[in-house]
Structures are given as structure tokens and as C-alpha cells.
Regions:
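Oxidoreductase cofactor-interface core, primarily capturing Rossmann-like NAD(P)-dependent enzymes
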Residues: 2-46, 61-64, 68-71, 78, ...
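Rossmann-fold cofactor-recognition segment
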Residues: 49-62
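Short loop/edge segments at beta-strand edges and connector loops
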Residues: 57, 159-160, 249-251
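Terminal hydrophobic/aromatic helix or amphipathic segment near a protein terminus
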Residues: 221-222, 230, 234-277, 310-319
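Amphipathic terminal alpha-helices
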Residues: 286-319
Length: 319
């Protein structure tokens, strides 16, 4: 069997942050790309089509549409939505359904994006007391384990830490609501370091995996380019945008009072106690260039200035 990807690659989540980055990276590398979308008429879907992505309409609840989308496809990029309060089985159901179709279609390479520390959750502090988002971590592990056990020709699981694009819309409004006032107010301790990766780097790893399936086959790869304190994050944002940004560490109660959701604050406490713990040198050992946060800020300068909502160079007193 040939390990060379010469046919199309199906990208799921292509209208989102990770899938979109992967689709663009694959196009730039010369691959033929299909995107599984529910509604081809959306702005994001049309933007992909304008770049040369072939849109295929499909839904995880319609297996026939998945079979059609997978026809003549040699590679699949998989990324799933996490559990929803009204649908706790969402990630497992959609992940396994896509995996089943990919296995039946005998794709050459299956690249799945999960999260760093997935599979290690039972070692988390207070795991047995359900302190953390149990279903989130269990869903990630369940899909990862199924991929490893399904008997695919080649597969790799990418496990990114926090994605830098969380500082951009739409995620920033929920994750860092105070950034609009030039502040990052969280329950993250001053000494806590947050492992981060750019979405484009995930795209680069996906391209490398589809380009050389045998090299990546069977690996689970934790991804982060840098580990920064929130003060270092604020400094990089200030320097890169010309807008003054400060970081403030609050108690959990204070963080919630200032607009952070309880679930978000819980994840910030997890950052303090556990964190992603990515071996950045191991990630670098694959030889794929990784983006430093300052580089990422520079490349998203105007978008970040709009998020911060202040004129470049303005001071706290001028707001």
C-alpha cells in the first residue's frame, strides 16, 4: 500500500480556528482540500471556497453525507466540538462516527486534534471529586483511544495546549472579557505559566503528517511553542500592539465578579494546579517551526488593537 497522499484531504471544523488553519496550510502546500460544512452559504464557508477549498455539505447525524464526503479521500483532519450542556455525548458521538467512516473508506492518514494532558486526567489533583470538567476530559480520551485501537493505516493525534487565537474574536469575549479595557483579569496566579500554540502551527504539523504518514504514524504529539506568565502575555500584547495591557491575578470570587464565567475560572484554577505540561523541546524535535507569542501578536496586530479597544499608545489615564 502506498503511503503517499495524492488524493483529496477532508477537513472537518474548517470554518473554525483549527480546521481553518489546517485547510489553508494544506492548500498552501499544494494539497487538494475538501471541507465538511453544514451550511455552504455561511461567510466562513464562502471564504474557504474562494481560496480553492471544495465544500461538501454534510452532517454527523447523516452518515450517508459523511460517506459521500469521504469518497475518494485519502486523508482526514478531525477536530470535534466538546460536550455541550444539552448534549454530553456530542464529542464522542461525532468523533467515533467520523472515525468509523474513515476506517470504512480506508483512508491513508487520519490526523486528529485533541488537547494536551488528555489521557492523563485521572492523575489530576482532585479528579475523583469531580472538581474539573469531567466529561470534557473523558470525551477527549475516549476518542483518542478509539483512534489508536481502530486499525487505521496511519494516524496521529495532535494535542495542542492553549491556542493563541483565544485572544481573538470570537473566543476572547468569553475567555478574556476585560481585554477590551486593556486588562487581563484572571484567577491565574502570577507565577503560573501557560503553554500556548498558534493555530497555524497546528496546520503545519498536519501538513507534515499528511506529507509523511509513516513518520508520524502512531504518535500522540503534545504541542506548545512557549510557556508564559500572564504578565509576560500582557507585556507581549502591549509591545506588539502599542496598546497598554496589564495583567491582574484575582481570587476565584473576584474573577467571577469581574465577568469571568465560573467554568472559565475553574479552568484557570486548573492552570494553576495542573496545566498542560507540554515538553516544548519534544515538540520542537519534530523540526517544524513554532510561532512565538510575540510573533503571533505582530501578525495579528490590527485585530488585537480592535479587541483591546483603545488607540495605539494610549495610557490607562486616557481611557
Amino acid at each position: 500500500m502506498s503511503n503517499t497522499i495524492s488524493g483529496s484531504i477532508l477537513v472537518t471544523g474548517a470554518t473554525g480556528t483549527q480546521g481553518g488553519a489546517v485547510a489553508r496550510a494544506l492548500l498552501n502546500a499544494g494539497f487538494s482540500v475538501r471541507a465538511l460544512v453544514r451550511d455552504p452559504s455561511t461567510t466562513n464557508a464562502k471564504a474557504l471556497a474562494s481560496l480553492g477549498v471544495t465544500l461538501v455539505k454534510g452532517d454527523y447525524d447523516d452518515v450517508k453525507s459523511l460517506d459521500a464526503a469521504m469518497d475518494q479521500v485519502q486523508g482526514v483532519f478531525s477536530v470535534q466540538m466538546p460536550p455541550h450542556p444539552d448534549d454530553q455525548d456530542l464529542e464522542v458521538r461525532t468523533g467515533l462516527r467520523l472515525l468509523d467512516v474513515a476506517h470504512r473508506s480506508d483512508v491513508t492518514m487520519f490526523v486528529h486534534s485533541s488537547v494536551a494532558r488528555a489521557g492523563d486526567e485521572k492523575n489530576f489533583i482532585d479528579w475523583e471529586s469531580n472538581r474539573w470538567w469531567t466529561r470534557y476530559w473523558e470525551s477527549k480520551s475516549a476518542v483518542n483511544n478509539a483512534i489508536a485501537d481502530r486499525g487505521l493505516r496511519h494516524w496521529v493525534i495532535l494535542k495542542p495546549a492553549m491556542i493563541m487565537e483565544n485572544f481573538l474574536p470570537p473566543k476572547v469575549r468569553g475567555m478574556y472579557p476585560s481585554l477590551a479595557q486593556g486588562k487581563i483579569t484572571t484567577a491565574i496566579l502570577p507565577e503560573t505559566r501557560l503553554d500556548m500554540i498558534a493555530a497555524d502551527d497546528i496546520g503545519s504539523f498536519a501538513v507534515a503528517a499528511f506529507s509523511d504518514p509513516a513518520r508520524f504514524s502512531g504518535h500522540s504529539i503534545d504541542l506548545a511553542a512557549e510557556s508564559l506568565t500572564m504578565e509576560e502575555v500582557a507585556s507581549a500584547l502591549s509591545v506588539g500592539t502599542g496598546c497598554l495591557v496589564s495583567a491582574q491575578s484575582l481570587t476565584a470570587a473576584e474573577a467571577i465578579a469581574q465577568g469571568n464565567s465560573p467554568g472559565l475560572v475553574s479552568s484557570q484554577i486548573w492552570d494553576n494546579l495542573e496545566g498542560y505540561r507540554v515538553d516544548i523541546q519534544a515538540a520542537k524535535s519534530w523540526g517544524i517551526p513554532l510561532t512565538q507569542f510575540s510573533q503571533w501578536v505582530a501578525s495579528h496586530r490590527e485585530a488585537l488593537q480592535s479587541v483591546i479597544g483603545v488607540q495605539p499608545g494610549s495610557s490607562e489615564d486616557e481611557r
